[in-house]
Amino acid sequence: MSNRRDRIVCALLVLISILHPSPARGQAHQALSNEFIRAEFAGPHLAAMIDLRGGFTLHIGEEDFALTIGGQAIKGRTLTSVKTQRSGTTYIIEYRTIPYIVKVIYELRPGWHFLTKQLMIEPLSPVDYRVNEIQAFGAALQPAAQDELPLSARGSWGILYRYPKGTGSSRIPAFGAFLLYQNPFNLWAKDGQAMTASYAPEIDWKAAYGPYISDRFCIGLYPLSGTVFPARAIPEWTFIPDYAKYLAENPRIDMAEVDALVECVRAFLLYRPQKSIRVHVPWCENDYQIDVATSDGWEEFKRIIDRAVEVGCQYTLFTPANSELSSLKENRDAWGWENLLFFAMGQKIRKGEWNPDQGPIPPSLQRTLDYAKAKNIKLVSYSYPSLPFMQNPEWTKWAAGKVGGYNGPDMGLRSFQDWWVGKLVDFVEATGAGGYSFDHWWIAYDNASSRYAQWNGCRRILETLRQRLPDIFIDGRQQYMNFGPWTWLAGTYPHPSLTDEQPESFASFPDLHTDRVSANRQRFAAWTYRMQRFVPPEILPGFITHQTERSDAMKVMRRDRFRARDWDVLGWKFSVLSSIGTAPFNHVVDYIPARDPDEFRAFSEEDKRWFRDWLDWTDTNMALLKHTKPIIGPPMIGRVDGTAACSGDRGFVFLFNPNHRQLDAEFALNASIGMEKGSEFMIEELYPEKGRLLGSPSGGFWKMGERVVLSLRGNEALVLAIRPSDAAASRPVLFNVCGMAAVTGRKLELSQVEGEIGTAPEIQVLLPGNIRINALTINGTDVQFRQAGKLVTARVQFAGDLFASSQALWKYDPSFTGGLIRASFTIPHRILDQLRRRQQRWPVPYTEDDLIAPWLGSHRLLLYAHVAEPDDAKDVTMTLDGKSVQVRKAYNNIYGNNKRNFLGSYVDLSSLEPDRHHILEVMLPQLAAGRFQGLFFENIEPEYTREIVK
């Protein structure tokens, strides 16, 4: 364990044990206990753990430890304990073996659902040594586990055991236990009920470092909830026709297991934000193409800073080029970005030409620092630890002279760790930088220190940096994003998208709007981080909007000004809510409309305020959002997904339909979403129809345990607030529409009631007292109604022809396998009017090349053939009113350079006459049953009216 705070605690505990020893033999049985679990000991050995909530007992027989130091194997059972110390939260046993003192430290703090065990090694004389292997735990566990689930490959992150209730024959496990080391190198050996847990640090330890303290071994107990999800993320975006069948046939994880692991990680966080982090990442608008040494380039980047501030960001990476300070020809990294590092000073730092604690800041950099300070935004440095730093030959000795590219320092060496941290601190102090985005950090070289030592060095760098600069921003990317939650305790968050943000780096969800594609990937990443990597919301990364394409149609990565306009007018709000709903603490804001002057001017004050208000909302509700967790299931084709952030008798629910067809979301008002108490609730819509109350079919207010079933339009995000009902309300309560309600005598009057054009919702009103009404008017129109007790219901028809967002032309048929489809439709005049108004509000003069991207030019009326797992080798053809129409293929990487970015096929129907009957024929290729999702109109937003049809 390299956590400095824990080292200090352990050292103090050992000092107490020395000053206040107790006899090792003949002592009474010891126990550690808190409000959740009790650990019982037989002499110096752990004998049992008891879950005090459920009554489950895990019996632990022949518990032991072992370790290997300098090739010498030491087994705990062969040693005699010489001292023990019991405090309120710890139990320490000391053993002596030539030439070492070994201390075994058990700890159980208040609030923990787990016990930890560590080994501390102290040589009897000040000598250096090598720790080969740590086996902190070996035992025979009873009862026998009914089932087990390794975490990561071969259990390298830990293991889960499931146990039945009692001694019956139930096949449904009722209790669970997790066992893990706080590192990604767990090793397991089993022989019947006996098992050992170890890891092999193979790390050299100097006496000057102090005692060697092992990583904690954790054992947690918990009742299982019965709410299960896939234990591994469903590969993007594989079509699963029967989710229940898939769940039954594949490994599952219980939500209680996930929650227990998340709480274990949370207990050791070194960074606990009090407000949300808001950082802009301008390489997502290709800021590397900008040279801030030129006047035009500086003005362009100033727009980026200004816009980042306007949408509420506190930080922005600073990654444009500066030809006065660095050049491409001097780059020595594998990716060709070294000229952008450390505010363009990275090459000089590597070569020793500029030391941040000594050298002056160049004028062009000082100008940038001054501008950011005046705008009250902190600049974040993009930084690579794995570069050919030659200040000490020891660092790159492993590479045998082949340095540069991917070959950099050995992270297992303390000399480099200390030098690197010193440079990072000096740079912050010299420039006022807000923090770092670490990338190109290789910690798994084959010929250097052990992989554990390299990983441990990365962890030590991060923890030391956090200790020296407690408020620093730390964004962590390749490669340490792959090494699990114990790597990330000191950082702000790991990589926001699991891998690079470029469109080619991940499989695209089929959708014509890139921000929705990106949002679906973000929720997939958040699911993976929460459900497979057990990341608490405090350090879980969001991702807002997208990264624009860098390569042209010839597959050339452009370093000149290329695709500087790429704002997804109709997709960005879905992306904002997707990120907030899954990662409310870390708002990673990517592409913003700033580089292009036309986009910069067109982004309205209303949109800026909407953006800021939602980020502010997360700060206001942070106490509840700490409880954010998935509900319903993983993001996938053909299903709705969501999250809940609930505690006690209130909370929030975010629901997302990534599909184009309308689908239902279903969840229960109970512990599965975090609701712990209360009997009756109100559900209020926060988005899209702010202030609308959703009524229970059984009577307006919702009951504890009731199932909530809500229909979501295609591509819709729905945000709900749940709170205790106002059962004693003195005024009528209106449900399912926005408006006002009042009772005059025996007449119920609803005014300012709005509904989507062409819809027919059921309106509910819950009356106060025992009022019986004999008349109902809605917006001045008499309406028929029913009254049952206090509840009045009426179904009303709002005027106009229904033509909704993602308007469908074909009813989904799960048995359809391709072939000919015929459909007829009429486009209301109001739809073309809506498109014209949007073009007036967003008057960006797109080029023909711009419009290859289907998300640009949102004034166009597009018809999309939505296919799950689309294949661009299979053509779709269409005829309209008997004439062939051009069918275009859409790609999230725009030019089709990577086939996994194929989004599907569409036609542009912008030139059609309104209010005229049209006949469409579509010929689809042979498809697996159910993969064709339907035909949908794109770029339509809901429109509302107060006109009621009698």
Which residues does each PLM region occupy?
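Polysaccharide-binding surfaces and accessory modules of carbohydrate-active proteins
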Residues: 28-40, 50-98, 102-203, 679-692, ...
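Beta-strand-rich recognition/accessory modules
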Residues: 31-33, 96-98, 109-111, 124-137, ...
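Short, well-ordered beta-strand segments enriched in hydrophobic/aromatic residues
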Residues: 36, 106, 115-123, 650-657, ...
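Active-site-adjacent "subsite" loops/lids of carbohydrate-active enzymes
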Residues: 282, 290-297, 337-370, 374-431, ...
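Catalytic domains of carbohydrate-active enzymes, especially glycoside hydrolases
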Residues: 300-325, 430-434
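Active-site-proximal substrate-binding groove within the catalytic cores of carbohydrate-active enzymes
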Residues: 458-463, 467-692, 707-718, 773-775
